[in-house]
């Protein structure tokens, strides 16, 4: 019997294989209880082209005194920041790799904010 983490990792492996066959950059998401992290990784998987997270000093300052990065507002902010950084790096289109997490809540907020900021997936 697999635990929740192993189940999530198993789902993410299947997704990464499908994305690798597409030969496009991928937007990966990792969600912890306290923070959310997003990275744009090159199509061959060898290089991180852009990244953003709620653990960054500027983001924590913008989120306020509590610095809460575990909510949908913080995820939306990270989605906007990752889209801006990806576009600055010359990336217009990516494949969304949710890392085995359900497309709901913070993951969905990040994805929708990235789309609104001009990143296509």
Curated annotation (Swiss-Prot):
Highest taxon, organism lineage: Bacteria
GO BP, sorted A to Z: translation
Keywords: Ribonucleoprotein, Ribosomal protein, RNA-binding, rRNA-binding
GO cellular component: cytosolic large ribosomal subunit
Record has Ribonucleoprotein as a keyword: yes
InterPro entries from the UniProt entry: Ribosomal_uL18_bac-type, Ribosomal_uL18_bac/euk
Gene3D superfamilies linked to this entry: 3.30.420.100
GO function terms (MF aspect): 5S rRNA binding; structural constituent of ribosome
Pfam families associated with the record: Ribosomal_L18p (PF00861)
Role of this protein: This is one of the proteins that bind and probably mediate the attachment of the 5S RNA into the large ribosomal subunit, where it forms part of the central protuberance.
Summary of subunit composition and partner proteins: Part of the 50S ribosomal subunit; part of the 5S rRNA/L5/L18/L25 subcomplex. Contacts the 5S and 23S rRNAs.
Stated family: Belongs to the universal ribosomal protein uL18 family.
Protein name: Large ribosomal subunit protein uL18
Species in which this protein is naturally found: Methylibium petroleiphilum (strain ATCC BAA-1232 / LMG 22953 / PM1)
Gene: rplR
């Amino acid at each position: 019997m697999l635990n929740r983490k192993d189940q999530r990792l198993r789902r993410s492996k299947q997704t990464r294989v499908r994305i690798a066959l597409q030969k496009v950059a991928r937007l990966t998401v990792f969600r912890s209880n306290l923070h959310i992290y997003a990275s744009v990784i090159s199509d061959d998987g060898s290089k991180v082209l852009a990244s953003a997270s709620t653990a960054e000093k500027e983001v924590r300052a913008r989120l306020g005194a509590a610095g809460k990065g575990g909510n949908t507002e913080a995820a939306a902010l990270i989605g906007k920041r990752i889209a801006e950084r990806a576009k600055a790096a010359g990336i217009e289109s990516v494949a969304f790799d949710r890392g085995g997490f359900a497309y709901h809540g913070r993951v969905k907020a990040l994805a929708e904010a990235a789309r609104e900021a001009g990143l296509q997936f």
